[in-house]
Amino acid sequence: LFLYPDDSDEAGNLLRIYQEYFMVCNGAQLILKEVKEKGYDLHTLPEHVAIQINDTHPTMVIPELIRILTTEEGFTMDEAIDVVSRTCAYTNHTILAEALEKWPLAYIEKVVPQLVPIIKELSDRVAKKYKDEKVQIIDKDKRVHMAHIDIHYGYSVNGVAAIHTEILKQSELNHFYKIYPEKFNNKTNGITFRRWLLSCNHELAAFLTQTIGDGYKKNAEELQKLLEHKDDQAVLDAIYDIKKTKKTELVSYIKDKEGVELNPDSIFDIQVKRLHEYKRQQMNALYIIHKYLEIKGGKKPSTPLTFIFGAKAAPAYVIAQDIIHLLLVMSDIINNDPEVSPYMKLVMVENYNVSYAEKLI
């Protein structure tokens, strides 16, 4: 299986459906197996399991669970739908089209024909209850709207920021919000300091423990105690030294991985995330070009600048691939220009992943 197939043609779309079904099929079977092994009645599944559907890619877990419960576990269709609807919840991360998948029914029939009768049943139930075309599961063009399955047959729908959730409720998913206002809620995205502090920055974690105690490891709000030391120069100097140590480690890591020598005393401007037009890496690139021209014109920055990018782009996303190419060409020009490189460097890290993120972030 290719991790990121080119889905610009039918073969790529079919492969993506294969991938999605492969994952949810295995996951669904494992979940039900573990619940049964613990001696629980599958009719009580929602009491023991919560399945979070992140964007629409795992949506087929809903009809797959219904299929297993009805064909292998003796459930009626009504019982299976009820249990699954109280087990699955949907998170919408973005309103971009690629996160709201719409698969031709014919494609699903080619890959997982066993799910088609169930999807049609779910669609028919919605169509009998609601006449609005905008909330149908199978539309007039015979496309299956995966997000619509999640919303109709899940117990919760959440966005990942307050403004995002309001957009879902008032605009993008307003037709559903009018039907199921009680399902919509917000869960603001965040980070776990246990990963990005305790695991990735042992020096800073040890210093915090020494300065404010270790209560913050279980209660993040205790990090606010650090504000009591905001005017303590010794504390500020210690944090600065730790930051410099970590920057030096990152410089060494990038030198080893990318072969680029960076200045640890420069300002690090880091943008690491999936490459997409709306993430605006191209805007950052234009700024770097502007700074390059300024330096060439004699306007040197008081502190050297280092720009670090890390990203992946879908194989069929031509513009995103072009932006990566642009950044690579720019890095070659900037880093090899003796007039500019002492004041500015650019590196596009290869194979950006969690291990790299732990160093960069």
Outline where the language-model segments fall.
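A conserved ligand/cofactor-binding region detector
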Residues: 1-361
